[in-house]
């Protein structure tokens, strides 16, 4: 009588991915009975031991071991999922791999480059705008300063006039110098001259 084999569910024991000219991912499963291996790309099953467009699958089974390798000859789309699934009648075990395109790093570099260029262009536009507005700003400042200076001069000249008028009214008349007076002042002066003579 043959000994009964103990049934073992499929279990993933090893997996790896490498990128050279092509992307290669491998999965190794163990189980009794020997698990079957199925690859899924973006939710779609990939054919076993054959070519499927840009995908090539190679599988080998030896005793309780099942090994499978998938090769991608083209770069995957951004965020594409690759699933390696091993199963037998006692269970299923799977590994999901998120594929990232090398182009995605280029997209990030392009984004950063565009961001830097945008900042430089914005700086240039702001500088040109400032240079265009600078004459208007200077003109406005000079007008304000001229108004202030005119107000100060007017204030000073009114003070000077007031002090000169005060001085003139306090100065005694010099003999023989003509006196300029208004009509009412000249009448008063005439009356004073007549009384004196």
UniProtKB/Swiss-Prot annotation:
The keyword Transmembrane applies. Disulfide bonds: none annotated. Its main location: membrane. The chain crosses the membrane at residues 118-138. It comes from the Eukaryota. Keywords: Membrane, Transmembrane, Transmembrane helix. Residues 162-176 have a biased composition (Basic and acidic residues). The keyword Signal does not apply. Residues 160-179 are annotated as: Disordered. This is SIGLEC family-like protein 1. It is a single-pass membrane protein. GO terms for cellular component: membrane. It is found in: Membrane. It comes from Homo sapiens.
